[in-house]
Amino acid sequence: MWFPDDPRQTGWERFLDEVAEAGYEWIELGPYGYLPTDPERLADETGKRGLRVSAGTVFTGLHHGPAVWDGTWEHVSRIAALTRATGARHLVVIPSFWRDDKSGAVLEDSVLTADQWRELARQTERLGREVGDRYGLRIVVHPHADTHIDTPENVARFLDATDPDLVSLCLDTGHYAYCGGDSVELIETYGERIGYLHLKQVDPAVLAEVREQRVPFGPAVARGVMCEPPRGVPALEPVLEAAGRLGTELFAIVEQDMYPCPPEQPLPIARRTRAYLRSCGLR
């Protein structure tokens, strides 16, 4: 889900029903306000379906430095509080987009200056410290298409600049492939930084068109660039094997970006994907 309320995506009650029906047990909160924000009601709605929450999600523009801290913390703190109330231990941090995901309008330069990189690292460490101290949560930063933490080079630069004790990575296999990355190589190189997984695939033929035509991420999703496993890349078996060799317990949340999304479309895909992942050894 991309938005708290949008007629072109599945309603929250149907979402919860179908997640459970497809055989999954864990969900993320998604955009704040999509699921109920009252902790007791949220616990009731998830509990009666046998679901649990693994993480909340926040959106940040920390490369802008201290000037955006107060607004960022106001956004983060209420989501962190709800996340803690669910019993989850992780907060997924998505960097701000340099290009609007709907219109494709360029919002700022796609390349950060050296000063902006320093602020991004410094303020993300601050966020990790504050979220950990105040809410007992671990932040996992999510490299994402059309953000400044996207390509293998930018992901490596970000990881090299941040404290492993404060900042981990949410490796989204689809976004990383979309931006030219190899998930297995990243796991093998920065294994100690991988704190969370999003399992996803991209359609290589659609991706080639997207790159050639410089299509923004939102319209690329509408074209079907994110596809149902095992039809796309990366192959998930080697990714899961590499993650297994780390010897740590990781959440692996299954996703397929679909927007706009006909309401009848997700459930059959979710069922087939769950069966496929079981065949890969994922319980």
What are these regions (language model features)?
Residues 37-38, 63-65, 101-102, 149-150, ...:
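Short secondary-structure boundary/hinge segments and terminal tails
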Residues 27-29, 53-58, 91-93, 139-141, ...:
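Hydrophobic faces of well-ordered beta-strands that scaffold small-molecule active sites
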